[in-house]
């Protein structure tokens, strides 16, 4: 029931808006998740859902932790609520200046709040971008002795945006996902089926693109790319 309320509220608060006539290949909706902070009831409901998700994992002995870490400024309010509720220490990441398109680059990533060696840390993020920032943050934490027990992802965009982390066997725990949000809105006549289909089509194509971007390609694929590049150079001469 909590999720259904959240889905509807994301629309009514205009955190999510649909584009009337999206151009082919363009994201068919707009999401400004920071708007949630201007709607206290919605923010509290999402925070409670995240908290309950962690409690279930903890009760089932799937995770054990002593620190909560916000990996972006947008995640700090949620991490603060959760750390207070669980009476755990809180950390946050300052990554200003990090080249997030460079995998394993840990320069300009600062862990604020006092991390100790062997801390067991849950990461909190609102939305993941299709880059290597989280990979770099995880590497930084581990280099300085922290243990990452899981990443709580508040909204899964269903675009393969963290496919690199799943292939690295990182424990990703999504709380909400875009498919469920739009299916709920369509089932309750808040949007047309057309928009659900557009979102699904966009996400499928974006996932394919992100797999190519974020994962190392097989050698035969690299050879094909190199061959095509040579042909393009030859034609242009």
Cite the ranges covered by each PLM segment.
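Glycine-/small-residue-rich active-site loops that bind phosphorylated ligands and cofactors
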Residues: 38, 74-75, 129, 157
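Active-site-facing substrate-recognition patch
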Residues: 1-61
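Phosphate/pyrophosphate-binding loops at sites that engage ATP/ADP/AMP, CoA/4′-phosphopantetheine
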Residues: 50-65, 138-147
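PRPP-dependent phosphoribosyltransferase catalytic core
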Residues: 1-10, 15, 139-237
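Conserved acidic residues
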Residues: 66, 119, 149
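Short glycine-rich phosphate-binding loop at a beta-alpha junction
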Residues: 61-72, 152-153
């Amino acid at each position: 029931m909590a999720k259904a309320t959240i889905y509807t509220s994301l629309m009514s608060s205009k955190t999510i808006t649909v584009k009337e006539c999206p151009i082919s290949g363009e994201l068919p909706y707009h999401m400004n998740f920071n708007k949630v902070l201007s709607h206290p009831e919605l923010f509290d409901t999402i925070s409670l859902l995240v908290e309950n998700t962690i409690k279930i994992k903890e009760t089932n002995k799937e995770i054990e932790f002593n620190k909560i870490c916000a990996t972006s400024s947008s995640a700090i309010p949620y991490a603060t609520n959760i750390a207070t509720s669980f009476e755990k220490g809180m950390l946050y990441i300052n990554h200003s200046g990090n080249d997030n398109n460079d995998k394993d680059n840990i320069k300009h990533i600062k862990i604020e709040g006092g991390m100790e060696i062997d801390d067991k840390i849950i990461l909190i993020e609102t939305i993941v971008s299709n880059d290597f920032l989280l990979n770099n943050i995880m590497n930084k934490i581990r280099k300085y002795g922290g243990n990452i027990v899981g990443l709580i992802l508040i909204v899964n965009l269903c675009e393969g945006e963290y496919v690199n982390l799943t292939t690295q066997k990182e424990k990703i725990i999504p709380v909400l996902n875009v498919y469920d949000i739009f299916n709920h809105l369509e089932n309750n006549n808040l949007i047309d089926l057309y928009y659900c289909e557009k979102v699904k089509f966009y996400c499928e194509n974006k996932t394919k693109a992100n797999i190519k971007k974020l994962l190392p390609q097989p050698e035969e694929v690299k050879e094909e790319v190199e061959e095509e590049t040579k042909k393009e150079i030859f034609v242009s001469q």
